Each structure stands twice: as structure tokens, then as C-alpha cells.
């Protein structure tokens, strides 16, 4: 790989990492090509990106993106996305189905280094759409109760 190719990879990764709110670093030793492609498909379906990069290049890109404190050792695959919950759900689900061949090592969520346990906890949260639905339900509840009370009052007056 030439120096210009390395520079291009670093620039691309830096821009991608800066734009994302969640980055996960995982071990993929033992995955078959078919399994790895399944990971890429699952990630793509949830708006995440997956790439295997040399640790030195990824380390430079992460530092350029102000993601400091990550120790990159051994083989790593990087998965990143704007949606922390979708990313966490995708990689944890894949880790469960990969028979110990795919392991989540750590991540970088919203400016801080997180461990695999934190990523697993985030994966158990409701999805973004479910959270929005819950919030809307809470917001509309008072109006719904008010309308129900007025309707009951109307029915009561009609009976009398």
C-alpha cells in the first residue's frame, strides 16, 4: 500500500469517525467470509458501516477525529454509526449468533471510551423509533384523558 493510499484511507476514516456518534471495535478471528458478509449486510441495514483497517491507520484516524484513549491490539474490525442503539443491537445480535468467533472489545460512544458491557446494556434499550413512540404517548396522554373526560361528561348530561 502506497503512502498516498494510506493517507486517503486515514482522511476517509477520519471524516467517517467524526460524523458518527458511536464506534465499536470488535474481534473477528475465525469468521468465515460468508459470516463477515452477513455482518456487513446487517450493519448496512441498520445504517452502520463495517471496515477492517490496520491498527496504525485506524489509530491515526481516531486521533484525528478526537477519539482518544482507544488501545488497538490484535485483529480488529471497526463498526460505526450515528445511532448508538442500532449499532449496539446489530453487533451484539451478531456476536450471539457467531459462536464466540465475533467478540465486542470496546467502543467510543459520544466522546468516551466504553467497554463491551456498556455496549451490551445499550443494546437492550428500546430502538430510537420505540423511544419516540413512548415519548409521544406520554405527551398526548393529558389531552387524551381530557377528551375522554369531556366525552363522559357529555354522555352523563345526555342521560339526565
UniProtKB/Swiss-Prot annotation:
Cited NCBIfam families: PRK00099.1-1
One Pfam short name: Ribosomal_L10
The entry's keywords: Ribonucleoprotein, Ribosomal protein, RNA-binding, rRNA-binding
CDD domains assigned: Ribosomal_L10 (cd05797)
Record-given protein name: Large ribosomal subunit protein uL10
GO annotation (BP), single: translation
Cited HAMAP family: Ribosomal_uL10
Function: Forms part of the ribosomal stalk, playing a central role in the interaction of the ribosome with GTP-bound translation factors.
A GO CC term assigned to this protein in UniProt: ribonucleoprotein complex
Complex and partners: Part of the ribosomal stalk of the 50S ribosomal subunit. The N-terminus interacts with L11 and the large rRNA to form the base of the stalk. The C-terminus forms an elongated spine to which L12 dimers bind in a sequential fashion forming a multimeric L10(L12)X complex.
Source species: Wolinella succinogenes (strain ATCC 29543 / DSM 1740 / CCUG 13145 / JCM 31913 / LMG 7466 / NCTC 11488 / FDC 602W) (Vibrio succinogenes)
Stored InterPro entries: Ribosomal_uL10 (IPR001790), Ribosomal_uL10-like_sf (IPR043141), Ribosomal_uL10_bac (IPR022973), Ribosomal_uL10_bac_type (IPR047865)
GO molecular function: large ribosomal subunit rRNA binding
Family: Belongs to the universal ribosomal protein uL10 family.
